[in-house]
């Protein structure tokens, strides 16, 4: 009896996950950016990274900021640094604080762009305004990590997506 219940529960959980994934995919096809993002996460969990990236791209194209951040993070993990900053910039433009923070860190450290604390500061300020505590830490004390002396004061260009 116990094995039967456990097996039934597993089938129900699997069916529920598949159903939710199907609902998100259908809603995504109808232009729901949040559904595209949620479907992308499900694809990522299933290790279907290509499909996940496609769904996240659709979410980003629909101006769903988390989809843009997902693409930025995946590109950065794949060492596509200049491309990751394009997606972080769009996430920031769509008022996702963590997108602003990620972009600011990359600009400050020179990941995908020339390093520039000066160019990073507006992104830290926006991250702070959007509630990201680390953004506020950089605004209050730009040198708080102690290794910023090597950074130039020049401007970094982040292309728009």
Outline where the language-model segments fall:
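Sec-dependent N-terminal signal peptides
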Residues: 4-14
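Sec/Tat signal peptide C-region and signal peptidase I cleavage site
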Residues: 16-20
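Short helix-capping/linker turns of helical repeat alpha-solenoids
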Residues: 31-32, 43, 62-65, 94-97, ...
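Hydrophobic face of amphipathic alpha-helices that form TPR/SEL1-like repeat modules
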Residues: 36-45, 68-78, 102-109, 138-144
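Terminal, low-structured helical/coil segments at or just beyond the last alpha-helical repeat
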Residues: 131-161
